[in-house]
Amino acid sequence: MWLKLFFLLLYFLVLFVLARFFEAIVWYETGIFATQLVDPVALSFKKLKTILECRGLGYSGLPEKKDVRELVEKSGDLMEGELYSALKEEEASESVSSTNFSGEMHFYELVEDTKDGIWLVQVIANDRSPLVGKIHWEKMVKKVSRFGIRTGTFNCSSDPRYCRRRGWVRSTLIMSVPQTSTSKGKVMLKEYSGRKIEVEHIFKWITAHAASRIKTIYNVEHLKEEWNKSDQYWVKIYLFANLDQPPAFFSALSIKFTGRVEFIFVNVENWNNKSYMTDIGIYNMPSYILRTPEGIYRYGNHTGEFISLQAMDSFLRSLQPEVNDLFVLSLVLVNLMAWMDLFITQGATIKRFVVLISTLGTYNSLLIISWLPVLGFLQLPYLDSFYDYSLRLLRYSNTTTLASWVRADWMFYTSHPALFLSTYLGHGLLIDYFEKKRRRSNNDEVNANNLEWLSSLWDWYTSYLFHPIASFQNFPVDSDWDEDPDLFLERLAFPDLWLHPLIPTDYIKNLPMWRFKCLGVQSEEEMSESSQDTENDSDSDNMDTFSSSKDIFEDKQSVVHSSPGRTSHCDTEACSCANKCESSPCERKRRSYGSHNTDEDMEPDWLTWPAGTLHCTECVVCLENFENGCLLMGLPCGHVFHQNCIVMWLAGGRHCCPVCRWPSYKKKQPYAQQQPLSNDVPS
């Protein structure tokens, strides 16, 4: 998780540097910055109208370019970044969707139950044509949608009873606006009563109703009273301008931030004495002033602070966020971090997506579970001071120059989603390259075959589904599945796969360990002479003995090789069992489990073996004989192996005996010990 968080922070740093790089390129090619002011005199009439469209100011009665330019200057300073965004938005030919209401409940759910937005609904009466034609309605939808106003069409033929109850007997336009200045207050419906069915007149009607909710100040005395008043609003934003009404984007934001930020419009059109504004620090007109308990902040002096809906919305959200804003932000960050697993995970393609889906589900579940106590914590009545200090910290941090850069980059990348996704993909491919290079340098095995990985995944699932998770030393002896079938059924009903994903290997250090010793060890020459004499003298006498030993050895090999899901031997070069020996080998002629005997001086010292172990002279993992001084290890089932061989076997995830498949961490009833008798072998 920390690795993914580091890569995500690194990605954000790359985005920040990339944005500065783009700014440098634009400055090198054009010699201008995004924060550089634009002189409206140098703009064409079309560009001036585009700026007014984005700010939400009507210009239908202004035929001259001079009047349009003055209206742009009265609404606020124009920056290069705002001009670029406005022209790009005007060139975009994307169609905006409009809702078609199916009936009363649909209308109530979206319009009347929505407390923090404006709706414009065209009602089409039965057997009547719509009030606004299709072409004009599409223009209307595109014009109002840039200010966050949602649109829809209600055809009375789908629910005539509701239309009669509402009194909609003719086609009309309905506008829904929050009635009170409190958050989630009541909604009032207003019907358009104008005679001119034109886009500009309808838009002026909408903006007039939206502006009526904003507190307007017309004289100095009212301004003094409002400026010195302290009420429930900690954050207030003032617009000092020489306009008849505030721009539409300002009115739309006042509805969106109802209950969080108070919007105040100061109309200085007929003011003769403006000395008081100088006293409170207002020197330029127009001015957007943010007043908080910490002081006054002049909006528009930093990077990305344009006179537009998107820029001011991003600015106010960072200062006075809702809990939903924080949740959405955390959701985006967590999912971006989870998607890093697609590039960090190495191996098969299916493996990458399986790990990705698992990570997405885990991270999102943990996020939702973590937010539940946070929501309950915020509703406690004794945390008002904590809430106030948190908002104050946000206001301090988000009014800095660095925060303005971050907001500007956020608007830039959200308006160019293809660039955002391509940089994320490139960053992920770089992570994948370096991670693959690191694993190759560490000689880590990477399984790139989908079928092999699926097979190993199935083996992993079945292994942990049926094997109990218990330590070797603490697991009771009498809890055997063979003796208690109910435990096996309970195991199937409640698997420990998602509760305990790994079997602990601490039990390995508790397994019995000792060295293989012979009662008498001869030199190599004597051993070879003795073996030759023994071979020549006992060809006829011990033929039955050797044949029976061969049969037992073949039976043992068939058992070992027929065990599913494991490797029955290891390479001679890789097995270091022979290097652990201290002296010459103790040759054996019979290699079966049980009691064995040859000459008395060649007999293994069985007394040094722990109780409950099966006597044998060969390791079935590497298929080599035990040699004098070799380190041995026994399993709970009683079978004995080279210590190095069985540790490698268990560390590879195969927690069972290579011979009988008994779990290596589970105790077993000891076998009846078979003591070797020297007089059992015929002479």
From Swiss-Prot:
Molecular functions (GO terms): ubiquitin-protein transferase activity; zinc ion binding
Protein origin, superkingdom: Eukaryota
Subcellular localization: Endoplasmic reticulum membrane
Any single GO CC term annotated in Swiss-Prot or TrEMBL for this entry: endoplasmic reticulum
Amino acid composition bias (Acidic residues), ranges on this chain: 525-542
Major localisation: endoplasmic reticulum
Keyword match Transcription: no
Enzyme class: transferase
Pathway: Protein modification; protein ubiquitination
Subunit structure: Interacts with DERL1 and VCP.
Name this polypeptide is given: E3 ubiquitin-protein ligase RNF103
Organism: Mus musculus (Mouse)
Gene label: Rnf103
